[in-house]
């Protein structure tokens, strides 16, 4: 009977350790999960205010403003329905251009300014992330989204 209780205790302890490990993994996964939003979704209030997320769309033509310090850049990201001002301090990718696709990761300030800590540019003229193409299509720009797939 004593050996049976030991085995039962080991099984319960093993299951508890397994459950704790799974909870820790899920917690770490959720903290590192980054969601993707369009400027229209941000304007509608769907984006989180207190955590990092990605915003994607096209860099609006004529919107790039470089600051005197040479590393701070401000530009507008649009999904053709709404636009969002993005500030970024750092080196932009070589393929970053007006009228091209972009995905920026960062946080939204109280005054609807997106402060990016990472900017990713579309890597070739025939590619657009599926999320961005779908978002552009949902925003009412099916011709543009189809042309950029």
From Swiss-Prot:
Cytoplasmic-facing ranges: 1-7
InterPro entries in the cross-refs: CcmE, CcmE-like_sf, NA-bd_OB-fold
Ranges per topology, Periplasmic: 29-149
A Pfam match: CcmE
Alphabetized GO MF terms: heme binding; metal ion binding
UniProt keyword list: Cell inner membrane, Cell membrane, Cytochrome c-type biogenesis, Heme, Iron, Membrane, Metal-binding, Signal-anchor, Transmembrane, Transmembrane helix
Stored HAMAP family: CcmE
Name of the protein in question: Cytochrome c-type biogenesis protein CcmE
Gene: ccmE
